[in-house]
Amino acid sequence: MQLSHLLLAFAMIFVMTIIHTPQVQADAMADADADAAINCRRYPRHPKCRGVSA
């Protein structure tokens, strides 16, 4: 395999990693919000759960 093909492959992997990373972070934040809602269902009187619909 030529060196240019290897460089192209690494460049594509690098770009796809950069594109995919924000989606992973958004999913992690959504999971944290879901966990907070579950905790508010279990502990509805907790001060942080005021105004959260169960």
UniProtKB/Swiss-Prot annotation:
Residues 1-26 form the signal peptide. InterPro entries: Pilosulin (IPR049518). Residues 27-36 form a propeptide. Disulfide bonds join 40-49. The keyword Transferase does not apply. Expressed by the venom gland. It comes from the Eukaryota. Keywords: Disulfide bond, Secreted, Signal, Toxin. Belongs to the formicidae venom precursor-01 superfamily. Venom protein with unknown function. Does not induce paralysis when a high dose is administered by intrathoracic injection into the blowfly Lucilia caesar. This is U7-myrmicitoxin-Tb1a. It comes from Tetramorium bicarinatum (Tramp ant).
